[in-house]
Amino acid sequence: MEVGEPMECYNDFAYIYDELIAEDVNYKTWCNTIIDICNNLNIEKRDYLDLACGTGNFSSYIGKNFAFTTAVDLSPSMLSVADEKLKKEGIRSKVVCQNICNLSLNKKFDLITCGLDSTNYIIEEENLKSYFRSVSQHLRENGVFVFDINTEYKIKEILGDNSFNYNEDDVVYIWDNVLQGDVVTMDLTFFVKKGQVYERFDETHVERAYSESYLESCIKEAGMKVERKLNCYEDKIIDDKTERIAFVIRKDEKKDDR
C-alpha cells in the first residue's frame, strides 16, 4: 500500500496488516477475477507489475501465473513482508521501493494491478495524471491494467465523519475520520499486544474521492481506455450505493505508444 504523495503510512503495522484487512477483503476472489480477465483477453503471462503492493497479497497470488513479478511500494516494511511471501511461493520476482506516480522500471508489463483503493491515496490531480501516464508508459500494447477505487459514496457516506473500532485479543484500534470536501482524513490509533502489555502507535491516512467521469478523462488523456468496470470485482450493476469499483483498462489503439 502506498500514497501518491510521499507519506509514512502502513509502516509500523506491516506485520499485522493482513489480520486487519482479512475480514474485509476476499483476496482469492478478487485475484481470480483478475486472472479470468487476463485469460478472456488473451493476455500474455510474461511480466506482472503490482503497484502499491502492500504485503504482497495480490503479488503472491496472481504472480503464480506469470513468468516474472515486480512488486512496487513506498513502504520498506511492507516490501519486506511482500518479498518473504513471494519467495515462499517460489515466484520469480523482485520488490522495488518507488512512488507509483513516477515509475522508472525500464520495462513493460502484460498485467499491471493497483488494488485496495490505493489510487484514492493520490490526493493531487497532477499526481493522479502522472500516475496514469506512468502506467501507460509501462503497459505493453496488448496488456491490461486493473485498479480499484473507493467510490464517492463510500468516502463521503460510509467513511465520512464517522468512527470505527476493532477489538480482538491481540489487536485493538480506534479509527476516527474527518471529511473535508472530497478528502477524508483517517486517524487510527492501534494497541498491539506484546507479551503482557499493549504497544500503542498511530497512523494517519488520507484518501480522495474521484468521480468515474474524471478518472476516465485522466485515463483517456494518458492514452488508455476503459474496457469495463466491475462492482467490487463482480459482474454486478454499478449504482449509487456501490462502494468499490474495479476498472479494466487497455491501451487506446487510436493513440501512439507513450
Segments the model singles out, each with a brief description of its role:
Residues 129-141:
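A short glycine-rich, Lys/Arg-flanked "PGG" loop and its adjoining helix->strand segment in the class I
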Residues 120-122:
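A short His-aromatic
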Residues 104-111:
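A short acidic, Gly/Pro-enriched loop at the edge of an enzyme's catalytic core
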Residues 49, 56-102:
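Class I SAM-dependent methyltransferase SAM/SAH-binding core
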Residues 115-117:
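Residues lining the SAM
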Residues 212-258:
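C-terminal lobe and adjacent flexible extensions of AdoMet/dcAdoMet transferase-like proteins
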Residues 126, 146-216:
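SAM-dependent methyltransferase
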Residues 2-44:
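Conserved class I S-adenosyl-L-methionine
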